[in-house]
Amino acid sequence: MWQLKIGADTVPADPSNAGGWLSSLNNHVGRQVWHFHPELGTPEDLQQIQHARQRFSDHRFEKKHSADLLMRMQFAKNNSSFVNLPQIKVKDKEDVTEEAVSRTLRRAINFYSTIQGDDGHWPGDYGGPMFLIPGLVITLSITGALNAVLSTEHQREICRYLYNHQNKDGGWGLHIEGPSTMFGSVLNYVSLRLLGEEAEDGQGAVDKARKWILDHGGASAITSWGKMWLSVLGVYEWAGNNPLPPELWLLPYLLPFHPGRMWCHCRMVYLPMCYLYGKRFVGPITPIIRSLRKELYLVPYHEVDWNKARNECAKEDLYYPHPLVQDIVWASLHHVYEPLFMRWPAKRLREKALQCVMQHIHYEDENTRYICIGPVNKVLNMLCCWVEDPHSEAFKLHIPRIFDYLWIAEDGMKMQGYNGSQLWDTAFAVQAIMSTKLAEEYGTTLRKAHKYIKDSQVLEDCPGDLQSWYRHISKGAWPFSTADHGWPISDCTAEGLKAVLLLSKLPSEIVGKSIDEEQIYDAVNVILSLQNTDGGFATYELTRSYPWLELMNPAETFGDIVIDYTYVECTSAAIQALVAFKKLYPGHRRDEIDNCVAKAADFIESIQATDGSWYGSWGVCFTYGGWFGIRGLVAAGRRYDNCSSLRKACDFLLSKELASGGWGESYLSGQNKVYTNIKDDRPHIVNTGWAMLSLIDAGQSERDPTPLHRAARILINSQMDDGDFPQEEIMGIFNKNCMISYAAYRNIFPIWALGEYRCRVLQAP
């Protein structure tokens, strides 16, 4: 049976750490790892798990998102004495009473407290993308470490996950709810084959997948990221790739297209890619590789036109078509530049560039304790370390950190989009519980969460000359996940700061000692340092180049990846944090904070669409963007009666309320940039929570509280017997076109919305 271990408990039981390869800044606070124990679990436990797996499989085409049941079952067993308050429902014609809301809130927080980790964070599923596991399987296969690193049970659960998320037509999407793409289909088909699955396995699912691939043009039509993965594996030729010259890293930084000016996720993915391309690395050609060469193409492998394949992309994948200028650049590099740099004397410069690239790879690895910024560059960096030296310490240091990314639920084992969302979820959870004015009843929960947030702050900048490594300051920031990950993010810093400021208002006997004042000042310094000239805030760093650079975005599947753009979410979070800080510390950098908030609020108004909406880039979508837009403007001092932006925003949200009450927004809103309801106009508890919070902040209860009453009824009636809330459609998004799971949102936002509703609507004078 699988068991989730958290924090320091992950280390002694980790067989991959036999040589002491794991390091940590804070004794692994926030680390979450699943271990398999063959002797663990009663027959009843195993039957319950099997039932959950079967139920998911039976309904996988209607309900594509797991409910994180394995984790919940484990916590339920650990809290077997837990008995919640009786459930309550509100009938259609019945008024929503304070008693009904209060009981729903207590039931919700009671339950949510039972699934909190011992270190204070809330573990959960951060999966969703379908192109992550293949990179891991391919890397481990090439390095010969597949069976040594992934046990039979790991491999079985990965196969379960891939089969469960295969679409009816035989293909796989970019993410769990998406239609089939060549990128998803080829990589997941290859993964199953590398894991030992044959054509007849999965009740014919493997053969069905191959048919989808061939019916849609074969693997030559895979996207550029897919071409790269297939090339290193040996089932696609490097001649069929557009160039990724490592010499870009040797160019002067003043050039607007220098990699150091790119969004950090973009540059950290293309950094190892250009190393592998520059070396034209190909893994061992084994019998399975020879077989895949025959299985994936419409013509014999030696007859594929690789030059033509460079720019081929299946129509199902084409979200961002290459502009003509890009095709001209790639053709010039491919036909003129690359032949020169593969020969002496220019090859000497190539070797120098490759050395430079590896220095940056090692810097990233060492400063994230080999977690890396995300799962794509994690496995690519690991592969590069092996290519550089198969016996290197760097490669061995990578191995135990693989498990930081693996998560298991009733749908199988997935690779998460980060090493978790620990800090982000915990900061939101604190604010949600505090909004209820019931905080003193949940002192233990808040104390643990407070400790997690304090333990997760980044206490030092990265070593060395930050400018040389293209890094922003980190000291005082909060990361998205753990301190060991360590990459600083503007909105995570803001939400972390908001949470500790709220908790500082409660007695230390209840929630523990407040964070040191200097650490709060450091967080404020990070936030102020991240404001761009347009007044907005980007994610990890300042915006370092120009939007026209997006013309060179080579990833056909994703939008807005080349530079770190400014976002309503990051800007709003910064405003809220600085305003909250100023109330408690009015004398610290007051003028700077006032100027920053004023510019940021103007930015939020300037990017509002004419219909009153804000596009949410990190959540689905206009309800999410609207929540941040409204909340930021209100924090900055705007009011409904003196701000047309707020009036338009409220009108927009109210126009999207469903006839049944509540809001339900499909992921298609983000992809197509047009507000789209969930199928059958069903409400979603998370969208409903965001819309409620927005309208309450904008004073809707003073004008007409009816939509809020309807929404509250939806949330109350959605609560389950045990106090949990149901997992509904996927609610996270990145790069316009890919969705990601935020499993904690189903608990956080009903609590937060009903908390604000109870205190600011029902208890309003």
From Swiss-Prot:
Its EC number is 5.4.99.8. GO terms for molecular function: cycloartenol synthase activity. Keywords: Isomerase, Repeat. SUPFAM superfamilies: Terpenoid cyclases/Protein prenyltransferases. GO terms for biological process: triterpenoid biosynthetic process. PANTHER family: TERPENE CYCLASE/MUTASE FAMILY MEMBER (PTHR11764), TERPENE CYCLASE_MUTASE FAMILY MEMBER (PTHR11764:SF85). In cultured cells, CAS1 mRNA expression is high between days 4 and 8 and decreases at later growth stages. Oxidosqualene cyclase involved in the biosynthesis of cycloartenol. This is Cycloartenol synthase.
